[in-house]
Each structure stands twice: as structure tokens, then as C-alpha cells.
């Protein structure tokens, strides 16, 4: 996909990024140029941002997307908060990269999962998620298409055989169609 389309799809989005590592947050801000990224270094700080009142109208803060670390910030608990508020969520991980955390992310409603080693590709990855949402398609099909070989290398060949029915449906182009509100650029 041409870079200009990626930039235009992301431009103006408000994103909540949560990670306990300041350098990761700095990278997220740099990679997501053209967006407004609110950073939080802890679960409590993220929850406060989610609950904060918007300046105009007194409504809750609105985010178009959340990018959450799984480990250091209670990311799986925070995932339930963002999904419960209709915020599309991408999970990041370095240390928790295993089939169990991937499955838990899917079950709890994350729309994508990205190893931190792929952080430089975050904008393209989010663009894929947004495009899938716009086309009422499963973002997970794209995740597995993009990262399936990396998962195989990390988890070992045949890792999906422990639960083949579960994994086959998330690789299907029709499964997991997005039912929350799509990101807006307002």
C-alpha cells in the first residue's frame, strides 16, 4: 500500500499508547506521526486517561484506537477496559509472545497483536487493522498473513495443533468481523 494512503488513514486519529518502557512510548509517538498519541506508563494512568473528562461537553475522553503492552501495565486487564468502551485495541508484547497470550488477546477482544520487534511497522500494521474494519473484514486474517511465519519461528512449527479449531477460524477471512464503531477522524 502506498505510504500516502497509510498516512491519510491514520492522520488525525487519537490513540492511547500504554507501556511501562519510556523508549517504547517514544517510538510509538515517532512511528505514528500525524496522529495524536496520549501516552501512559501504568494501568492506573491509562485508566485515568480513559475516564478523564473531555474539555468540551464533559464526556469521557474519546480514543480511536489503543495500543497496549501486555505485561508491565496489566495490559490484559486494560484490554477489557478498552474493548468494553468500544475502542479498537492492538496488543504489543516482547516477553509474553506465546500462543497463550495471543489466544487470550483474541478471546478478550483485541483486534491485533504485534511483537515489539515489529514496532517500526506499527503504522502499517494499524493501517491494515483500520482497512479491515472499513471493509467489515477480520483484522486477524491480516495479522496471520503478515506475522504467521514469525509466529511459526517463535512458537515452533505446529504450535496451532494444540487447538486447531480455534486457530483456523481466526485465519478465516470471514471470522471476527468488527462490530464496534470504526475509528473516526473527528
Stretches found by the model and what they are:
Residues 6-23, 27-29, 66:
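Conserved acidic segment of CheY-like receiver
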Residues 46, 75-78:
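Short alpha-helical interaction/output segments
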Residues 53, 60-61, 81-88, 108:
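Conserved phosphotransfer cores of two-component systems
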Residues 77, 84, 96-128:
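Alpha4 helix (beta4-alpha4-beta5 surface) of REC/receiver domains from two-component response regulators
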Residues 131-186:
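C-terminal output/effector regions of signal-responsive regulators
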Amino acid at each position: 500500500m502506498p505510504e500516502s494512503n497509510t498516512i491519510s488513514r491514520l492522520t488525525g486519529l487519537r490513540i492511547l499508547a500504554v507501556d511501562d518502557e519510556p523508549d517504547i512510548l517514544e517510538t510509538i509517538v515517532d512511528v505514528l506521526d500525524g496522529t495524536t498519541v496520549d501516552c501512559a506508563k501504568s494501568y492506573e494512568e491509562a485508566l485515568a486517561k480513559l475516564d478523564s473528562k473531555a474539555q468540551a461537553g464533559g464526556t469521557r475522553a474519546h480514543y480511536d484506537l489503543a495500543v497496549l503492552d501486555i505485561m508491565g501495565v496489566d495490559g490484559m486487564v486494560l484490554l477489557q477496559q478498552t474493548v468494553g468502551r468500544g475502542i479498537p485495541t492492538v496488543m504489543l508484547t516482547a516477553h509474553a509472545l506465546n500462543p497463550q497470550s495471543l489466544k487470550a488477546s483474541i478471546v478478550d477482544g483485541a483486534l491485533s497483536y504485534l511483537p515489539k520487534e515489529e514496532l517500526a511497522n506499527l503504522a502499517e500494521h494499524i493501517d491494515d487493522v483500520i482497512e479491515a474494519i472499513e471493509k467489515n473484514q477480520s483484522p486477524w486474517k491480516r495479522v496471520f498473513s503478515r506475522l504467521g511465519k514469525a509466529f511459526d519461528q517463535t512458537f515452533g512449527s505446529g504450535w496451532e495443533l494444540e487447538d486447531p479449531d480455534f486457530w483456523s477460524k481466526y485465519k478465516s477471512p470471514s471470522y471476527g468481523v468488527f462490530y464496534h464503531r470504526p475509528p473516526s477522524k473527528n
